[in-house]
Amino acid sequence: MADAVKLSNLIKDNKSILEVYQGHEYIKDDKIYVSDIYRPGLELTGYFDFYPAQRIQLLGRTEISYAARLDHDIRMHVFNKMATKATPCFLISRSLPVPKELSEAAEEADIPILRTGESTTYISSILTEYLRARLAKRTSIHGVLVEIKGMGVLLTGASGVGKSETALGLVQRGHRLIADDRVDAFQKDHNTVVGEAPKILRHLMEVRGIGIIDVMNLFGAGAVKSRTEIQLVINLVNWDPKANYDRLGFEENTCTLCNVPIPQVNIPVKVGRNIESIIEVAAMNFRAKQMGYDATQTFDNNLTSLISEHSKEDTNKEPHND
């Protein structure tokens, strides 16, 4: 988890939608400590009792038009109170004109002013998601994260079980590698966990007998992705002939990542099993269940119906005593 996000990084990573209107010289050392974006409302009326100065202050059409109705002295007073040492920056949406009083107050307090052509709601959503992802608490997981047909699948299992080799086979079949060996996971929202590779391991994979390979250079940019939502965990286990493995799919297991329960499938590994194909089918079957079709439940319903029909036939065939 990062304690703060540099304002310079926020601007660089969102340069297609953000521009520095004023205060380039103040950007280098500014940091953002919270993910929430604030739209000052009551503050424009002079009420500052609960003003969250540490947030990015976003002014849209409503705020700018209301401020324009205020007298010059009141506007100056309000913007001076909003421009505190804790304020990372002001952001003006829709490429609206920056009030002169805000420009002066920001200059006096060494606060940069940013501007965007995007709508207020859209830019708030984009920056909030960006900040949440970078300020979120991260958990390191030993495993391999791949994306199969748009679904994030985390491969786990004991060292040497073949996670990396399996992931390499999946990449050769057209799927994407996110992270090998170590996955950094964080909770995006209440029900969503996102995984990514540490910067130093991005696009790299360790294959026993070969060493380190660069997946993007070998297979192209379409074979990798920076991050993805973890929707399914597939745990690879060494085949045990004495174990009683689930053959019908009635068992529904979960594991907990970042306090979020994630569905888990245990797949036994042994020589001769095409693990890549099995994992592909497991991912597609999971998606089918999400869409409302459960082959196991359908089989169970059909079997129950068949047993019921045979029971009725047997009852009808029983001899009657006169």
Swiss-Prot record:
Residues 205-214 are annotated as: Important for the catalytic mechanism of both phosphorylation and dephosphorylation. It is an enzyme of class 2 (transferase). The active site is at H142, K163, D181 (proton acceptor), R247. ATP binds at G157, A158, S159, G160, V161, G162, K163, S164. Its EC number is 2.7.11.-, 2.7.4.-. Residues 268-273 are annotated as: Important for the catalytic mechanism of dephosphorylation. One of its GO terms (biological process) is regulation of carbohydrate metabolic process. Belongs to the HPrK/P family. Homohexamer. Catalyzes the ATP- as well as the pyrophosphate-dependent phosphorylation of a specific serine residue in HPr, a phosphocarrier protein of the phosphoenolpyruvate-dependent sugar phosphotransferase system (PTS). HprK/P also catalyzes the pyrophosphate-producing, inorganic phosphate-dependent dephosphorylation (phosphorolysis) of seryl-phosphorylated HPr (P-Ser-HPr). The Walker A ATP-binding motif also binds Pi and PPi. This is HPr kinase/phosphorylase. The lineage of its organism: Bacteria, Bacillati, Bacillota, Bacilli, Lactobacillales.
